[in-house]
């Protein structure tokens, strides 16, 4: 069956991926976010989706709210016309926007057995979110988790499905490693420390040819914001990637894109995920990467070897990419979402 899905997400890159994926399954997808018009997104971190169906009447219902933040207002109270149109609603981690209108959403949900409201967790849930969600889960809120490690959060509210983030291997490919440099793609790596573990990056890459990428990287020797195509080119050409995580996420889309592109990824270990007491048990990035250590000196030694030995890097790349596609490739994840939304 074709579902009429309203997305109320809080991550423009994941929004792009979800609009693309769910539309490719055959569903009608309307996003209350940067991709409200898929052909002209508000954010340039990912490309436009001109082939995705547009819904101008639904967009008008948001545009005419007259708020200083129409998207936030529409997520906080879905306009009646959009609610009448939808049979499936999916939220990310700003769940107060959902809970604040829960009585009318609950009534809507009970009005038709085909209707569904789903919390898609994306690596931002902590103990408070989980405990708050429990009564809503009892009243019909579904949950699609993105990592098995989420179950280690105290008070975990449970899930109805575990479906990974994905990366399309036809989009994320072409690694050559011709430039002996270590990179990382993270927004505000230095500014958001300790959540981004910038100190580990600094120690593990000190003395190596390195280049952090992303907004804010200009203060630590990087170019700052780069275009989507430039970022992809860096993933293809750089020899190695040093991943330091973003707490409390188990893993990130940036990690997946690196893994599937094939650039050898060496990760920070879980011991550094200590902002939350349960952080080490929540982290998964080190298990997905090609190597890891809690010791930045050991990570540096592996990175140095990759920089000096392109043949070794090539072997690591081939194994890593095949494993990443098997776990996170678009075909696998598309089939899982298709089955869940039947």
Where does each model-flagged region fall?
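Catalytic core of nucleotide-activated saccharide and alditol-phosphate transferases
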Residues: 90-194
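Short alpha-helical donor nucleotide-sugar binding micro-motif in glycosyltransferases
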Residues: 83, 228, 232-238
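N-terminal pre-catalytic "stem/leader" segment of glycosyltransferase-like enzymes
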Residues: 1-104, 292, 327-330
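Short hydrophobic beta-strand element within catalytic cores of glycosyltransferases
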Residues: 264-274
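Conserved catalytic-core segment of nucleotide-activated headgroup transferases in glycan assembly
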Residues: 166-228
